[in-house]
Design a protein with these regions (language model features):
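Short, ordered loop/turn segments at secondary-structure junctions
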Residues: 32, 56-58, 97
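Short hydrophobic segments within beta-strands
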Residues: 54, 94-97, 160
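Alpha-helix N-cap and loop-to-helix initiation/capping positions
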Residues: 66-74, 103-110
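Flexible loop/hinge segments that line or gate small-molecule binding clefts
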Residues: 36-73
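An alpha-beta-alpha
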Residues: 79-122, 130
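Hydrophobic alpha-helical
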Residues: 11-19, 26-45, 127-188
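Hydrophobic alpha-helical segments within soluble ligand-binding/sensing domains
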Residues: 67-93, 142-144, 188
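Amphipathic helical "hinge" segments at domain boundaries
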Residues: 1-14
Length: 188
């Protein structure tokens, strides 16, 4: 079994190199990103070694199979659930964690597509206001960003995080006694 540091392309490459040096009959991969994972899967295809993907579906890599959620449908459903409580809101918050100018996972990106699709079809007049937080930010950075966001958008009372970091917002809300804002998230 080989483990890599999540969100580290270098760590992923080091581990897949070790994997390819061994005698393997098949591989189960939790992808890092499309292009880095493609480097590995191209080598697996060259050697006729089958592989399956966990968590992130990347059909372009031609896996034997995929195990995980349908992220588009998940985001679509999340929007539907959020709007049960926010159906009269003019604006809602979409908290995104960013690394190098993009969201940190393919699943999060696909959830957002599903989320926005539902909102476009069912709540086209509700504005989605993004709050972008750095992936490896400090508590002080998060606190400053959240304070500024809610001062700039006092009418926002509902929000969502399409990753497992809703606790960052929830923690800030608790510490600042902001009981007028609800946050929904994944993998809590």
């Amino acid at each position: 079994m080989f483990f890599y540091q999540r969100f580290s392309n270098q760590s992923f490459e080091e581990e897949y190199t070790k994997c390819l040096d061994g005698q393997i009959d098949g591989v189960i991969i939790v992808p890092v990103d499309l292009e880095t994972t493609r480097q590995f899967t191209n080598k697996l295809h060259e050697r006729s070694i089958p592989f399956v993907l966990l968590d992130s579906y990347m059909p372009d890599l031609r896996p034997l199979s995929f195990f995980g959620q349908d992220s588009f449908c998940s985001g679509f459903f999340a929007a539907r659930m959020l709007m049960l409580i926010a159906n009269e809101d003019k604006q809602i918050m979409l908290m995104k964690q960013m690394k190098d100018g993009r969201v940190t996972s393919k699943q999060q990106a696909n959830r957002e597509v599903g989320f926005r699709h539902y909102m476009h079809d069912h709540f086209p007049s509700t504005e989605i206001v993004e709050l972008q937080l750095p992936f490896n930010g400090t508590r002080a950075e998060y606190d400053a960003a959240l304070k500024a966001f809610f001062e700039e958008h006092p009418q926002i009372h509902n929000g969502i995080s399409l990753n497992s970091r809703a606790h960052i917002v929830g923690d800030w809300l608790l510490r600042n006694n902001r009981r007028d804002i609800q946050i929904m998230g994944y993998d809590m």
